[in-house]
Amino acid sequence: MHEFRAHQLNHFDLPGRIQRLGELAYNLWWTWTPSAEALFSRIDSTAWDQSGHNPILFLRGVENDRLQAAAQNLDYVDLYDRLCSAFGSYLKAGDTWFKRNYPDFENQPIAYFSSEFGLHETLPMYAGGLGILAGDHLKESSDLGIPLVAMGFIYTHGYFSQHISEDGWQDSHRFSLKFEDLPVMPLLDENGEPMTVSVELPGRILHARLWEIHVGRVPLYLLDSNVDSNNEADRALTARLYSADMDLRIAQEMLLGIGGVRALRMLGYNPVVWHMNEGHSAFLGLEQARELVQAGQSLDAAYEKVKAHSIFTTHTPVPAGNDEFPLWLVDRYFSNFWSELGLDQEGFIDLAGREHPNGQPTFSMPVLALRFSGQANGVSELHGKVARKMWSFLWPEIKEEDIKISYITNGVHTSTWLARRMGSLYTKYLGKEWRDHLDNQAMWERVLEIPDEELWRVRRHLKRKMVAFIRERARRQWIHHGVHPVQVIASGVMLDPYALTIGFARRFATYKRANLILRDLDRLIDLLNRPTRPVQIIFAGKAHPSDEPGKMLIQEVYRAVKKAENGGRLAFLEDYDIHLARYMVQGVDVWLNTPRRPMEASGTSGQKAALNGAINFSVLDGWWREGYNGSNGWAIGEDRDYDNPDLQDQADAESLYDSLENQIIPLYYQERSSDGLPGEWIGRMKESMRTISPRYNMHRMVKDYVERLYLPALNSKPILHEFKPVSPELLR
């Protein structure tokens, strides 16, 4: 495994007996290790909550007498010793899955680039599922012992904080992160000065300093352009995610791709595999080719070498969702770069140029990534098919089904998303070592042995816990923000911990159709308010600040939530983040997902919910098209695509209401057995857990990346061909 380059100074005033709390605070291992959070919360639970579960702020601010009391508490010290021992063993482990199976490659670095990483609520460096997946990928790579090193950005303002106004409009509040208050460490040179990397921009040099996060055994390096030597505009390059400003965006992606390669070189890494998580980092292929050409290799040889060791994962099933830059902008930013590749302007543009029937030609980042990758993949079976069709123009001589864009279906990091009580139940019935065998189907068959009453008891506890959390959240809004009483009700203060509860939480993009269930609002209200069979629905999610249709969708949903006829059975929870997501995926009974097929590349929130005993109710798109077996959840609509979106919406809405009214609600409220248990519901819950948990976890997913993509790239020998950019005619 890699050595960390930044070493945290223990600047906390801690009793000697519990001195290693400072070390634990600076490694995110504690965030996914059972009982590790208790090392902080048991010192002072109120202060822990007030810190936002930030161990750096907590240890800096907690009263000294609380620390002294913990250091003298025998039970606490026993827990501390056990977890410190486990942490030390984890970091030094020589017997990892990767080392056992592939010992020849344990010192061959794999570089993983992503524009966002969702690791914990204290690090708001993510906008949605792409970042959460990247964060889970790092955690599982650490668990499996993959020699991964990651590169991304640390954003000065993080992602925005969301507030919903009385009329339902999303207000975006920016805040500045204080990096010294986060579990991130600056990289310093031998003189104690910040290490920086530079990238040439038009008429100036962009500088970025480097930070490091310890994700278990995996180092994550983060680029930060907010340094004094940059002009004001360049200092803002890493201020926030996904700017709509094209000038800023191309400079940002140059920093990630080109600057990221240079940063790894400066730190002494020589990755053998380069993995691009989406196209934002595709310039890394150009930088590696430039290095090789400047070292004396031909462009042909450089291109083949870079391609042989590069992997591109695409997550976007629609062309409009991919980054493309106008040619004049590329000309402006790369006019001094292409000569270092031995290319002229036309040859450089042909690397990734695209013609558009009714518009100006562009420079496509996914095209660049595909051309410089020996292997590419989508993130579900259906998405792989969609991606092969979308990018088939790049390989006109190959049949669509033979195009080498494979798929690896997404999964989730089990220990991050699993409720503690559910984890204890798994330990009791699956075995003490169950977390080491997450992809073992035979082990998961033991779910059927869990007594119904024990499983139901845990499920009821998790829902009560979620409802209590939501109510307390609403109470704080009332006290601290003076919101209108109707907004307090809309925030979930009237939720019933014993009613059938449906969750819908995700980024509010229009294709995700959060309003599909509201299409016939009168019918829905009737279903919600039947006295003996109450139903409640909890919505949560953010729209990108520049996504006006997404914000209008939130407003439509919020206005429906506020209607008095709902009786408080609809709720919208503002400021959705990882912390709220954990409560929801652990607490709801049914997880609803309504994307317009085939636009959901994969999705993972339903996988998290299934792990905790919720049952999926979803359109047959993304991962659910593979996961659904007819008895482990419910499908919305048919396994088909529509040419007419209005017909699709109508058909899917009718299917949704029909299943809800005639299958889901009756099954939950069926006549209970003498012990008060809904036996058939629990049976479907167990079938969901048994079939989904072993397949749709990050343990299986990262192993798939290793065996199907990383190892072939590690073993790859470049085959020299004459370098021929794609003909512009084929890019139209």
Regions found by a protein language model. Give the residues of each.
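Catalytic cores of carbohydrate-active enzymes across secretory and cytosolic contexts
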Residues: M1-R732
